[in-house]
Amino acid sequence: MSGCPFMAKKHHFTFSELSLEDKHEDNSQEGLNKASKGGLIYGDYLQLDKVLNAQELQSEKKGNKIHDEHLFIVTHQAYELWFKQILWELDSVREIFQNGHVRDERNMLKVVARIHRISMILKLLVEQFSVLETMTAMDFFDFRDYLSPASGFQSLQFRLLENKIGVPEILRVPYNRRHYRDNFKGETNELLLRSEQEPTLLGLVEAWLERTPGLEEEGFHFWGKLEVNIFRALEEELQAAKTKPDSEDKEEHLAELQKQKELFGALFDERRHEHLLSKGERRLSYKALKGALMINFYREEPRFQVPFQLLTSLMEIDTLMTKWRYNHVCMVHRMIGSKAGTGGSSGYQYLRSTVSDRYKVFVDLFNLSTYLVPRHWVPRLNPSIHKFLYTAECCDSSYFSSDDSD
């Protein structure tokens, strides 16, 4: 019986010495090992001794070590680290707006880049649920009782994130019929209160939008021109539709045109906007809404391209926050069904109530699509405003009044 067929023949391998030219080209081993000389090393820089030893299994402390509790802890610690980074980026953006540095258009690129970074982190956090979902409901049940009364609702950083972005306090769903801050004590409660009193990203963006060039009544007066164009075009379509022979299609078309007139009538009614604002159905001031719509219509103009990217990224943040809440709801429902949460809430029922427009901060930006019209209805830029929007300057005088300039 023969041995291994692959060894039936002896193979001889010869390795020729690298030529002098090849030796010169092989630079992969020519570096210096600086770590051997002492100084800061990787583990010390990241303080990995603290991070990697911060996983304390409650089940193990109780003498019943459950394997999947380790995954549960690491996943939530990862969430909290990313929340910290989001807050770091968010605070820097708010500072740029607050200090007036946004007047320099070069800083707008910085703002857009950091807001986009927040979006990318949130996208990662949404996808991270898939790792936690490798744990079955029974796996979670094995150690769930060890967690009480700890609860995800007690995440200070997530509540700070909501406040700093601009989730309205009056629209929050009560937690067990109590104010959300009642679940935090001492310094954490004070931090939350302070975050409610600070300028929010929503408020800062609102003030910025109110300074959009072209809204001035004594200047281009975009809003007035848009109103005239829209109602003139709708009236022309209405009259043209009336001349057509009677039919079911004609009646439907007339009814649709009438709805359009009512829709745009509400848009140009400032008192109605203020009423919706008081009810929490709108977030931006009337003037800021005008600015946002103008940026959308003229987004191809050089001066509005970066602002349009910012508005798009703000909507992306809202979208991803909603997806995060929804994925969280689905996971909780899968893991505990209709049981109460470990912190005492109604669990799935409470979380489901937070997946709504109540928690959307930039909902007005989403609703702008309601008011899109054919391009030829949009007021044409006169030479003066066109030249102004065509050139982006280092110091942007368009986003602050002459009284503010120095």
Swiss-Prot record:
EC category: oxidoreductase
Domain of life: Eukaryota
MF GO annotations: heme binding; metal ion binding; tryptophan 2,3-dioxygenase activity
Pathway assigned to this chain's UniProt record: Amino-acid degradation; L-tryptophan degradation via kynurenine pathway; L-kynurenine from L-tryptophan: step 1/2
Organism in which the protein naturally occurs: Xenopus laevis
Residues binding substrate: F72, I73, V74, T75, H76, R144, T342
Described purpose of this protein according to its UniProt entry: Heme-dependent dioxygenase that catalyzes the oxidative cleavage of the L-tryptophan (L-Trp) pyrrole ring and converts L-tryptophan to N-formyl-L-kynurenine. Catalyzes the oxidative cleavage of the indole moiety.
InterPro entries: Trp/Indoleamine_2_3_dOase-like, Trp_2_3_dOase
The gene coding this protein: tdo2
Quaternary structure, from the entry: Homotetramer. Dimer of dimers.
Assigned protein family: Belongs to the tryptophan 2,3-dioxygenase family.
Gene Ontology biological process terms in this record: L-tryptophan catabolic process to acetyl-CoA; L-tryptophan catabolic process to kynurenine; protein homotetramerization
A UniProt-annotated Pfam family: Trp_dioxygenase
Chain residues that bind heme: H328
Cofactor note: Binds 1 heme group per subunit.
rRNA processing found in the keyword field: no
UniProt keyword annotations, A-Z: Dioxygenase, Heme, Iron, Metal-binding, Oxidoreductase, Tryptophan catabolism
Cofactor entry: heme
EC numbers on record: 1.13.11.11
Protein name as catalogued: Tryptophan 2,3-dioxygenase
HAMAP family xrefs: T23O
Catalytic activity: L-tryptophan + O2 = N-formyl-L-kynurenine
